[in-house]
Amino acid sequence: MSSYENYHKTSRVYDKTRSAGGVETILQALVAGPLPLQQQVLVDAGCGTGLYTAALIGEVQRIEAVDLNAGMLEMAQSKLTTEFEEGRIRFHQSPIGTLPLPDDSMDAVMTNQVLHHLPDDAAANWPGHTEVFREFARVLKPGGCVIINSCGHEQLEQGFWFYRLIPDALQAVKEKAVDLGTLDALLQESGFDALHREVPLDLVLQGDAYLLADGILDPDWRRGDSIWSLVAADALADV
């Protein structure tokens, strides 16, 4: 559940402007694991409407899709009815800090653009993130990997043309997003090593919806990026 966005409402139009970017990078990380792809069980932690699950379901043995928001899970389930009936995916309504999965049972965990939604406290060294990372470590088999799709502060400042129109919201998102150095430290403290970072080209280039200059005037377009929920009504009128 997002600490600031109403995803039950947003779930109905979320896919209008979103796509599963960086899938090839995720696959490269999975291929580097000890098991062949078709034998791997993958956790999609914060699966949302199932964009990444749908993109990867044909590559792995099974996906455990987890999200706290019922609306998001409903949309994900509607995409993957056949796979659910075949037992290739299981859905769980749960926070990602308490995964309903056994210890040492998963081959990999991925979380895509989720971490900045965690209720957390930077001044206390991000205990919410630490809880989540330790939970990932708990469910992973020895040698398993965690794949995090997230934005650093530099990407937030330079990677989205419309963010400069809403500077207060941008600052609020930066305060919710862990800087990359701290992220590495939190992961290491939670038991992860061999850290690697990559910027997928398709995420840098964005999709067609990103280039719509008048998209900011469309409420459905804005719902594709949770930053807009942090824009005050009077500030939105000035955009």
Question: Could you describe each region identified by the protein language model?
Answer:
Residues V43, T49-T98, E131:
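Class I SAM-dependent methyltransferase SAM/SAH-binding core
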